[in-house]
Amino acid sequence: MQWEVVIGLETHTQLTTKTKIFSGSPTRFGAAPNTQTSPVDLALPGALPVMNRSAVERAIQFGLAIGATIAPYSVFARKNYFYPDLPKGYQISQMDLPIVQGGRVSFAMEVDGKTEIRSVQLTRAHLEEDAGKSLHEDYHGMTGIDLNRAGTPLLEIVTEPDMRSAAEAVAYAKALHTLVTWIGICDGNMQEGSFRCDANVSVRPVGQKEYGTRCEIKNLNSFRFMEDAINYEVRRQIELIEDGGRVVQATRLYDPDKKETREMRSKENAHDYRYFPDPDLPPLVVSAEWITRVQAEMPELPGAMRERFTREYGLSDYDAAVLTQSKAMANYFELICSIAGHEQAKPAANLLMGDVASAVNRDGIELDAAPVSAAQLAVLLHRIADGTISNKIAKEVFGAMWEAKSDSPTIADELIESKGLKQISDSGALEKIVDDVLAANTKSVEEFRAGKEQAINALMGQAMKASKGKANPAQLTELLKKKLSA
């Protein structure tokens, strides 16, 4: 039997407000336990919540970014459940009338070697408060409660069950991560829990309209874990059904060490939480004027920039998609092009996606902290374009520039000169190299003249080796062909 996978994601994004959603307590990460709390966060009698305007504005920004409907009137509700790190005995959230309704997130993904633009429909995005934290490992035989996180503002973003593979779910999650960090509503730090996903996974026979029984995998805080967890859960459900069993609706956790999911508890439905409107908070009213003001302050979005990069710079869909995965990368690319010229767009993209990205990842730094400026890279690109150095030598020069950490705008020229890396373009010098190589490699010469055209590659390699990589490849190839055909 052929199976179809059905996936929906719920993503909790921690909003970048300085204070909590219903109190004036700070939201800084890493403070000593229970030092960032207030009577509201601790649920002391008589303490009343007050809505954080900045949290609402960030929700409006997100709604505008995905083309959603911003509800002019939305309501907060109490989600009732007991947990030690939830002092009120309920979480303030939104149920029937969320602030953001509908919308769509588009993203690029590789399918069979081709770049496809796909999109996922969103059901809603609603504001809510985070719970505190239970600390199980810090105390022997006891659990500590840290309420610093209680009341931190969250925007929970819920998709329709539109995704059909773990790879597609990860591509969507990465695009969402890019979007919320791009517009500045979330810092996207998955290790600190600022961006965490729950995946609802089910399977059904191909062609069946009804959905299968879903299981929710909670708190996936890395894209790799998300893909592994979904793939495992899909295999588990299919094997269970094919062995005559049935999938039971449940909440599950992913164990990255064992690479498997395990049941945490039976899966609740909305009625289990007994939602009802919170009497301490008035309805949230968002005026058209407020939306217009927020819209005027919105930056160019990743999707629009991706399309502009293909149109304005002639980049492929793939290159444009990679460059717009991060606002820092996109801005860096445009700055290089503004200095080096649009004709250097493709070489600039290759340099950023290759050597620069590799160096940033190797050193574990952010692109903003890169020791090589856009102006310095523009000079390097010009030296490749004017034939001063080859692409191969450019890699060596870039590595030296990265290590030098120099402020000099002409560091590329200085390194090329001091290391003697200028490309050999003198016809006399190249001719001597070619003559020596042909004389020393008579077998390859005979093979080429006998019709084995790839034999020229061996000769080219020997010639480049003889020149210590400094020969102009185009001139060298032309000269080799001319001599071999004589």
UniProtKB/Swiss-Prot annotation:
SMART domains for this protein: GatB_Yqey
Entries under Pfam families matching the protein: GatB_N (PF02934), GatB_Yqey (PF02637)
E.C. no: 6.3.5.-
Highest taxon, organism lineage: Bacteria
Reactions the enzyme catalyzes: L-glutamyl-tRNA(Gln) + L-glutamine + ATP + H2O = L-glutaminyl-tRNA(Gln) + L-glutamate + ADP + phosphate + H(+); L-aspartyl-tRNA(Asn) + L-glutamine + ATP + H2O = L-asparaginyl-tRNA(Asn) + L-glutamate + ADP + phosphate + 2 H(+)
Gene3D superfamilies xref list: 1.10.10.410, GatB domain, N-terminal subdomain
Protein keywords: ATP-binding, Ligase, Nucleotide-binding, Protein biosynthesis
Main enzyme class: ligase
Listed GO MF terms: asparaginyl-tRNA synthase (glutamine-hydrolyzing) activity; ATP binding; glutaminyl-tRNA synthase (glutamine-hydrolyzing) activity
InterPro entries in the cross-refs: Asn/Gln-tRNA_amidoTrfase_suB/E (IPR017959), Asn/Gln-tRNA_Trfase_suB/E_cat (IPR006075), Asn/Gln_amidotransferase (IPR018027), Asn/Gln_tRNA_amidoTrase-B-like (IPR003789), GatB (IPR004413), GatB_C_1 (IPR042114), GatB_Yqey_C_2 (IPR023168), Gln-tRNA_amidoTrfase_suB_CS (IPR017958)
Gene Ontology terms: biological process: glutaminyl-tRNAGln biosynthesis via transamidation; translation
Family per similarity comment: Belongs to the GatB/GatE family. GatB subfamily.
Subunit architecture: Heterotrimer of A, B and C subunits.
Role of this protein: Allows the formation of correctly charged Asn-tRNA(Asn) or Gln-tRNA(Gln) through the transamidation of misacylated Asp-tRNA(Asn) or Glu-tRNA(Gln) in organisms which lack either or both of asparaginyl-tRNA or glutaminyl-tRNA synthetases. The reaction takes place in the presence of glutamine and ATP through an activated phospho-Asp-tRNA(Asn) or phospho-Glu-tRNA(Gln).
Entries under PANTHER family matching the protein: GLUTAMYL-TRNA GLN AMIDOTRANSFERASE SUBUNIT B MITOCHONDRIAL AND PROKARYOTIC PET112-RELATED, GLUTAMYL-TRNA(GLN) AMIDOTRANSFERASE SUBUNIT B, MITOCHONDRIAL
HAMAP family assigned to the protein according to its UniProt record, in alphabetical order: GatB (MF_00121)
Listed name of the protein: Aspartyl/glutamyl-tRNA(Asn/Gln) amidotransferase subunit B
Annotated gene: gatB
